[in-house]
């Protein structure tokens, strides 16, 4: 079984699609005259689908890699900000301790 045959969607197989449609206009389709074209078209559509799937997998890997890199950058930035906040809090607590000693 193949998808709906559309020359615009399956451009690599357009010639075979047209040939099969032309063959099906005659009575030859009832006597197996179109079978060779049909098998060639099936092979072409399978190759086209596999090529699209391979490209989709490659694109997904690239998107996943970019997302992972961004996540790591965000984690590093978050750690840096957390460290800065902790340092500021320590400075404040040391300053408050020193001010408290002078008041006693």
Swiss-Prot record:
Query: Which residues belong to any copy of the CHCH domain?
Result: 10-52
Q: What is its main location?
A: mitochondrion
What does the UniProt keyword field contain? Chaperone, Disulfide bond, Membrane, Mitochondrion, Mitochondrion inner membrane, Repeat
Cellular compartments per GO CC: extrinsic component of mitochondrial inner membrane; mitochondrial intermembrane space; mitochondrion
> What Gene Ontology biological process does one annotation of this record name?
mitochondrial cytochrome c oxidase assembly
What is the recorded membrane topology of this protein? Answer: Peripheral membrane protein
Give the transmembrane region(s). none
Record-level Gene Ontology MF annotations: copper ion binding
Residue interval(s) of motif Cx9C motif 2: 34-44
**In chain numbering, where does the motif Cx9C motif 1 fall?**
13-23
| Disulfide bridge positions per record | 13-44, 23-34
InterPro entries xref list: Cyt_c_biogenesis_Cmc1-like
Among its keywords, does the record have Nucleotide-binding?
no
* Pfam families, A to Z: Cmc1
- Indicate where this protein resides in the cell: Mitochondrion inner membrane
Q: Which family does it belong to?
A: Belongs to the CMC family.
Q: What does this protein do?
A: Required for mitochondrial cytochrome c oxidase (COX) assembly and respiration.
Free-text comment about domains: The twin Cx9C motifs are involved in the recognition by the mitochondrial mia40-erv1 disulfide relay system and the subsequent transfer of disulfide bonds by dithiol/disulfide exchange reactions to the newly imported protein.
Protein name from the UniProt record: COX assembly mitochondrial protein 1
Species in which this protein is naturally found: Schizosaccharomyces pombe (strain 972 / ATCC 24843) (Fission yeast)
């Amino acid at each position: 079984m193949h998808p709906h045959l559309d020359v615009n969607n399956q451009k690599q197989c357009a010639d075979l699609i047209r040939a099969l449609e032309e063959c099906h206009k005659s009575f030859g389709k009832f006597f197996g005259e179109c079978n060779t074209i049909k098998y060639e078209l099936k092979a072409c559509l399978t190759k086209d689908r596999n090529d699209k799937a391979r490209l989709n997998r490659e694109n997904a890997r690239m998107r996943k890699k970019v997302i992972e890199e961004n996540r790591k950058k965000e984690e590093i930035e978050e750690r840096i900000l957390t460290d800065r906040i902790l340092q500021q809090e320590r400075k404040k607590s040391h300053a408050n301790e020193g001010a408290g000693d002078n008041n006693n």
